[in-house]
Amino acid sequence: MLHSKEPISSLEDMVGQEMRGPTRVVTDLLGELGATPVGMPLPLIPENLSKGVISGTVLPWEVTPSIRLAELVSNHTELSGDTSLYTAVFIMAMNWDSYEGLPDDLRQILDDHTGKGLAASTAQVMLDADAGGRNVASGNTFITLDGAEIERWKAAAQPVVDRWVTRAGEMGFDGEAAI
């Protein structure tokens, strides 16, 4: 989700935008899309929007009320369908030896409440959390990029994907398989 002072309805609209990115990869992505990427922590977004240091940010809806983003920007751009600008990965991990050291009944509880079931329910919680941020911004402008425009953004973003795959390979991982 892009939140910006000026409307962003095409790839060309990204040019000249000073956009805050949450991670190194997303910051690289913003640069490939034509924006001037700016890295900064979340708490600095309101001040930097107010001062004109940035003109927008990439941020999930559920976070926006906590920094009063809807009061600082009036445009919100999202991609149509189930496409998103990027994906954040959350991992719940446990040391294997610790897991193996648990009694069978406790391992069974963990097995029953993790994996695909936990992933699906967590994804739904994240989707449901968007409603609060959307409601707060209800008087603002919402822009949804259509399929043809999304394809243009994907083509522009491909160098970021290629670099990620290369870096993964350099670390001994199959980046293509991960994607």
Short names for language-model regions:
Residues M1-I179:
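N-terminal secretory/targeting leader peptides
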